[in-house]
């Protein structure tokens, strides 16, 4: 069954002024759509491949485009219109299991965000910053993946796209400004839902 581009759970301009409508339209309709199209093409080619060599040759396309589709599908749900703008619940972390786990690990939400942003900004080239649940220890950890690699070692709770297409048209080369702004539109309610689901 072919993969399809998921609808955004909000309008393209809903995350302004923190993420512009132009970025959201390009990111969703062009970049994510390309990952979906390329993943479908790679899977079709894999199904027709008749030799191990042909199947091996398709592995990188499957990983890259499959990861791009998985990561972005999670990313859109990870965002919400900003509460500070009176538009939604973005940026609002209420008392509950997620806030408690963050405070237990990092002392405060501010400390967590500082460490997350520093770790994510240090990625060389393109990639993703993650807050993930370590399935072995049941603890939250900050980690990164390169390019479009999906997070396989942890259960993803929050993912932040640090590819230039996610921020360059608005923030140019200043990753720090993008990383500061994105927390104002992070959907902590969705992140907490993932955490609760992962710890059942």
UniProtKB/Swiss-Prot annotation:
Gene Ontology terms, MF aspect: manganese ion binding; superoxide dismutase activity
GO CC terms, sorted:
mitochondrial matrix
Entry EC no(s): 1.15.1.1
UniProt remark on cofactor binding = Binds 1 Mn(2+) ion per subunit.
Presence of the UniProt keyword Iron in the record = no
Cellular location(s)? Mitochondrion matrix
Question: What InterPro entries does this protein's entry cite?
Answer: Fe/Mn_Superoxide_Dismutase, Mn/Fe_SOD, Mn/Fe_SOD_BS, Mn/Fe_SOD_C, Mn/Fe_SOD_N, Mn/Fe_SOD_N_sf, SOD_C_sf
Instruction: Describe the reaction catalysed, as an equation.
Output: 2 superoxide + 2 H(+) = H2O2 + O2
Q: What is its main location?
A: mitochondrion
The record lists Mn(2+) as bound by 27, 72, 161, 165
Q: Which cofactor does it need?
A: Mn(2+)
Coiled-coil region list? none
| Quaternary data | Homotetramer.
- Membership in a protein family: Belongs to the iron/manganese superoxide dismutase family.
Stated name of the protein: Superoxide dismutase [Mn], mitochondrial
